[in-house]
Amino acid sequence: MRRFATLLSLICLCAIQGFSQEWGTRWICHPQASDTAQVWFRKRVKTTTPQEKAFITVASTGRFRLYVNERNVVTDPFLGAIDSLEKHIKQYTIDVSRFLEGRETTIAVWYAPTSKRGSDKQLSLEFYGKDQRGKPFYAQADGSWFCKEASSATLGPGQEAINATRYDKLWHSTELKEKDWQRPMDSADTLTLPLQDSSPLYQGIRMSHVLSAVDEVADSTGVTFDFGRSFHGWVRITLRGAKKGERLCFGDHSYVCGGQMDEQAFPRFTITKQR
């Protein structure tokens, strides 16, 4: 009986740690972006004494990439979002201490919508820790942040529209001046979902193989590439000599060329089964 009680307590404890209520969580969103727009968010957090230890707790109803001082904090292609049954919002707590650079930290998030509900709960983020004197600090995503529509849009499941002419390579930079950026607003979505802490049990998406096409066939409709096997991932196309504004389609995605010497055309938030 004692063994059963201990096991029951452990299960209950795991459940409490794994899920928490959304009550009190602050959500922000772009004030004017459409439901298909991907969004850049950013904020500089300053302290009087150099920061020594820090964590970020972040959640979104979409998929996202998280950067601290210009560096991607995880090796995954993206993080997020609502689980497949749309009953929980995934939340992550990440130790970002190794990315700290003194008294100022630049946090940047690239958000992409995925929710079928069209929620404007685009980002919830808390940044907290202690400085070199042991003094705690805390900041959260709120109206003091900056936001801007990104250079891509998510038009539907497995479908991204990418416009390289609108890409700003400094969007997550520590040097960017946010002259043409906007302030975000609080979410108007009143529906609450439990937050699922995905940090302890999270199995990240990892790139395991890089495949090259084994055959290609060109006709009047375009070029078909055969990779010789089925795979779960995405296609990256290297373009050379493409003119700015030229448009191409690959799979269900569209791409507007930026006119760079070597361009990489690929979806940032879409992984599909292909051959």
Annotate each PLM feature.
Residues 1-22:
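Bacterial Sec-dependent N-terminal signal peptides
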Residues 21-275:
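Extracellular/oxidizing-compartment recognition motifs
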